[in-house]
A protein has these predicted regions:
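N-terminal leader/targeting and assembly helices and adjacent pre-domain segments
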Residues: 1-217
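Acidic, glycine-rich two-metal-ion catalytic cores of nucleic acid-processing enzymes
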Residues: 222-269
Length: 269
């Protein structure tokens, strides 16, 4: 009989993690929508074909890594002008400072600002989606554990209902060293910086519009993966924490914690 309840507990966790994947799918849509916004806004800024008077990718990254204010293209051009520059940089400046290129520079400047706005929106939506899901997950874990305990013992004992404050206390726990909302903020902020860097690399290296769109899409895909990883990790913790609280409510003094490696376990784990 104990084997049945072990399998039942494992199945309950499987269902909770399946729900976590569904929530991660919803968050991934937010990232895809944000990616589409940036890709659309980047249209007509970059050339359809590679231009010759540009820096190599290595040169562009070397320069950007030493440049602090990446929100101002004018300061970027001034920095290039002030540094010891070779023929390629002189030709690049001539092209970027030409009147015909001015409109593109202005659109790119607006796009850099738009990236911050878009990622702020991503952060707010992701935090709202995750918090709502974690609350439901925690409540479900609590009541499901008590229900299973009553079935296993055959006792219909009374128990305290889990309240919102109890769930909020668990959600506020910095169990991994940083609250999940701060981790979401760091992930979205890092992604915003990465996207802006890649847009500037496209400007300096002459990447085409299609190449730029592909890079942006790839980076947002990486952001969605980081968001999914966060949801999986936090979901597992919150479900386990409320399960433990439910056991305590049932008067259980000791329980055996069962863990297993799954296909998503990282190399560190």
């Amino acid at each position: 009989m104990s084997d049945y309840w072990e399998k039942r507990a494992a199945w309950d966790m499987y269902e909770r993690m399946a729900d976590a994947e569904d929530n991660a799918d919803l968050v991934a849509r937010i990232y895809r929508s944000a990616s589409a916004q940036i890709v659309f806004s980047a249209q007509d800024i970059f050339e359809k074909y590679m231009t010759k008077h540009k820096l190599s990718k290595a040169e562009a990254w070397r320069f950007l890594n030493s440049f602090q204010d990446k929100d101002s293209i004018q300061k970027l051009l001034l920095e290039i002008k002030n540094k010891d520059s070779g023929k390629n940089k002189q030709e690049l400046l001539k092209e970027l400072e030409a009147p015909a290129y001015r409109a593109r520079i202005e659109r790119l400047q607006r796009l850099l600002q738009q990236v911050d706005t878009v990622m702020q929106n991503v952060y707010q939506q992701e935090q709202r989606f995750d918090t709502s899901f974690f609350e439901q997950l925690a409540e479900n874990a609590y009541y499901r554990t008590i229900y299973n305990t009553q079935r296993k013992t055959g006792l219909g004992f009374s128990f305290s209902h889990v309240d919102q404050k109890q769930i909020e206390r668990v959600l506020r726990m910095n169990w991994s060293g940083k609250h999940y909302s701060k981790r979401i903020w760091k992930n979205t902020d890092d992604l915003a910086k990465t996207i802006k860097d890649e847009l500037l690399v496209s400007l300096l290296t002459g990447r085409t519009d299609r190449e730029t769109a592909a890079v942006i899409t790839e980076k947002f895909g990486g952001g969605a993966i980081a968001a999914r990883r966060l949801i999986r990790t936090e979901s597992c913790f919150f479900a386990s924490e409320l399960t433990a609280q439910a056991y305590k409510e049932c008067g259980i003094k000791k329980y055996r914690y069962m863990a297993t490696l799954d296909l998503r376990t990282s190399k560190i784990c």
